[in-house]
């Protein structure tokens, strides 16, 4: 294969896109156009009938790859020396191999193919561009500067046009980037909406999960309470003899305590009743057993009550000592018992007023004793039963 034939085809197609003033590169968006120019060359050769060719050169999949590259890398600069590597990475075949395999019956591009397609002549774009540059230089340059070198004039015009071209390219690049930014913002907003939707779903799922956990805990608590119930089958098998025996023992102890307190209350009440009967019989019959009654009276009264009663009696006797003669006259005048009864009764029992005073103090001591005894019994009963 002649390297010159492939280079001529490639340079021809490259020159249709690349501008001499912009540098030795094309943009990524121009890649499909470059491939289309090469395909047009081979289609014209097939129409002329000079060569048998395998067309199309590129499949639809490869063309889709070229279009995707041009859309994603619109302003990516493809330099001429980097084109082979970029093309091979896209279709996994070099461009030279694809063009050579297009010819049927030969293994390389025929040398007369270049002449028949008139690929040696410079492109019309380059010729027209050169004519415009020379015309523009002659028109825009003032007469006083015609003495300057034509090369300098052309270089100045080329620099200005190059700058204009670069500005236009930058504007297009900026517009494309702005559109990409808008598209990205739209995608970001959509992603935010989807994220919020997923967050709401996650929150609802988490709430349901917590509700299920709570329901599970409630069921577990109910099951545990059922197992701890004494009537449940798990507890019925436990030996309850010890518990019942303890209950019986405590009940028996409380019953004994109640019986003991009842007996004590009966004894104390019986003693008080007997004391009341004795005092009543003394008041009614005025028996001569004064000393024995006085001893019983002393033993029945507590020590502190006895002291109070003694003080009261002493005070009463001191008061009555001065008026005793008058009392005797009054008593003997109204109450004249027989000689036998006077001998049987004590001197104070023969007096109605003195006997009433003594029996009044004795009744007071009996009532205080009974009240104190009942209070002690009530306190003991309250301590036993925790009242």
Swiss-Prot record:
Transmembrane segments: 311-327
Polar residues composition bias: residue spans: 220-230
Matches recorded under InterPro entries: Mps2
The entry's keywords: Coiled coil, Cytoplasm, Cytoskeleton, Membrane, Nucleus, Transmembrane, Transmembrane helix
Coiled coil regions, renumbered to chain: 117-232
Region (Disordered): 216-235
Range of residues in the leader sequence: none
Keyword Nucleus set for record: yes
Membrane topology category: Single-pass membrane protein
Similarity comment text for this entry: Belongs to the MPS2 family.
Subunit structure: Interacts with BBP1, MPS3, and SPC24.
Name under which the protein is recorded: Monopolar spindle protein 2
